[in-house]
Amino acid sequence: EAKEKFPLLDEESIRGAMWDPDAGLVTPRSQDVVNFAVESAKEKGALSTYTNTPAVGFEIKDSRITGVKTDKGTIKTNKVVIASGIWGPLMGEMAGVPIPLMPVEHPLLFFGPLPEIQGTDEFLVYPLLRDQGNSAYVRDTGRLHGGMLEWGYYEDKEPRLVDPEDIGNPEKTMTSDSMRHLNLEEIAEPLEKAFETTPILNELGWDERSSFNGLLSVTSDAGSLIGESPEVRGF
């Protein structure tokens, strides 16, 4: 049954599987959903946005937030929500608020393309396969990346933390700050296990130019950071 759901699986390599019909992926990208929400709010007059306007500091009076300093002036406000992900600790530093979050490298390798789905009009052809024992997953990229297969790995033993100050290091990044150079030796063992579960990856070979280390926002307890800080009210 697992093979029927995910034809790329070697059923001899597993003892069993679970199927979650309610699981899903945001396609083509989660950014599209966020952009839709932002534009909808702007059209209703409920939101104003300031693009290409970096925050460079905060105004704080009597341990309470009073404004956001930008390179174009100050925005007066009594509430600030930090939603900058991997850059969150840097924003916290500007307000004197420690944010217990660290960027962690997340290897993403691309294989193919897979002839059976190359040229498809679908964003996703097969269900996403999670190998929990290997802390990894395999999914196809549909038409978004021309039928490539994506393998992602979560380092569960010795995660590679990245200093937030080092995110934009030009010697370590590729086409964007959150895409870092990949060292295949660091993931050789889990990748070999992936070849056993999904041999098609080894047959197709990996695309070095498309593969990279992404960055995840990770907290010490893997939970969310929600609520007002004890150091600065309204922050």
PLM regions with names:
Residues 1, 232-235:
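Short, intrinsically disordered, charge-balanced linker/junction segments flanking boundaries
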Residues 1-39, 43-44, 50-51, 57-64:
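Flavin (FAD/FMN) cofactor-binding and adjacent substrate-gating region
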Residues 21, 71, 112:
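Conserved residues at the C-terminal ends of beta-strands
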Residues 44-45, 95:
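Helix C-cap/helix->beta junction micro-motif
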Residues 48-49, 99:
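Hydrophobic beta-strand scaffold residues
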Residues 57-64, 74-233:
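Active-site substrate-recognition segment that forms the wall
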